[in-house]
């Protein structure tokens, strides 16, 4: 088990132990009650932390994409109806998450919805918060760790700069896990979308994705759709981020957390807290539109800005003169 995966495993045990507390939106960690300065000073301090860092580990989660318009996962937003309107009208679905886990009457309908979901993220342009973040990171030694499966970071950076530890919408896997391989989902998804036309809600039998080895139905290589394949590609993601952290442990690392919610704090947030505490020169910066969680143990090494992530990143970029 890699260094970072071991950290995640430890925090998952913590999550299980305090499950009810987490479900209520809380945390078992003792939080800081340190007063925040004025807004402009918060932005200035964040820009200073970024400027002074030798290296930055970005932890990008769902709130980052939501801030740029990818807010159709859990809410019936305009962006949801734009992409999934036909399914909302016919089935009463209110968000992409609900549709992804719906018990569909046929696999043809299921794949019509999943193809629409995957196509929406695969073809989405780079969202504004990601562009501002990219500008902020220019000239810095950085690495990206993400639980997002929407490929936004992959549209900006090469594979060796990003660890996607929860999967990627560009790939399929075998539902039976008969093989360790994942394979391209982009072209099959495109064909399914073409078959749907303007108003259909079911794909033909021959377009339902299947494993090229055993013929079993495939599903997206993302955690949550079933038996998530934690094979070679998955292990490579943890190896990349573990290697990067170990190579930079003695430097002034800034752990930059963006948009972590309360469903999966064990993948980015809590490991970042633990690493900030453990590394003598490390600092922690979180930007979140809802949650003001800064552990008391790192209150002198950390900062949380509560606000619109898109707005905060733009203001930090401007403060940096970029």
Give short role names for the model-derived ranges.
Residues 1-322:
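Conserved catalytic alpha/beta core of Sir2/sirtuin-type deacylases, generalized to analogous enzyme cores
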């Amino acid at each position: 088990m890699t260094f970072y995966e071991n950290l995640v495993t430890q925090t998952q045990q913590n999550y299980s132990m305090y499950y009810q507390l987490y479900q209520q939106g809380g945390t078992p960690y003792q939080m800081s009650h340190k007063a925040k300065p004025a807004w402009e000073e918060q932005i200035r301090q964040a820009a200073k932390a970024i400027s002074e860092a030798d290296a930055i580990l970005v932890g990008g989660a769902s709130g980052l994409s939501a801030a740029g318009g990818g807010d159709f996962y859990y809410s019936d937003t305009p962006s949801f109806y734009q992409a999934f309107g036909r399914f909302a009208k016919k089935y009463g679905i209110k968000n992409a998450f609900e549709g992804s886990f719906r018990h569909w009457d046929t696999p043809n309908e299921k794949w019509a919805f999943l193809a629409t979901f995957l196509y929406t993220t695969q073809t989405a342009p780079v969202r504004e918060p990601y562009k501002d973040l990219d500008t902020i990171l220019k000239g810095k030694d950085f690495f990206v760790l993400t639980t997002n499966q929407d490929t936004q970071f992959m549209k900006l950076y090469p594979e060796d700069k990003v660890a996607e530890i929860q999967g990627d919408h560009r790939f399929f896997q075998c539902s039976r896990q008969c093989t360790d391989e994942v394979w391209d989902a982009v072209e099959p998804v495109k064909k399914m979308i073409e078959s749907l036309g303007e108003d259909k809600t079911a794909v033909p039998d021959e377009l339902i994705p299947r494993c090229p080895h055993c013929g079993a139905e495939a599903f997206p290589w993302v955690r949550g759709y079933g038996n998530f394949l934690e094979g070679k590609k998955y292990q490579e993601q943890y190896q990349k981020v573990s290697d990067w952290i170990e190579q930079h442990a003695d430097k002034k690392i800034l752990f930059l957390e963006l948009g972590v919610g309360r469903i999966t704090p064990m993948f980015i947030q809590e490991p970042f807290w633990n690493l900030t505490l453990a590394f003598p020169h490390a600092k922690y910066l979180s930007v979140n539109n809802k949650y003001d969680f800064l552990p008391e143990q790192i209150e002198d090494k950390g900062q949380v800005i509560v606000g619109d992530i898109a707005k905060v990143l733009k203001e930090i970029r401007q403060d940096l003169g970029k």
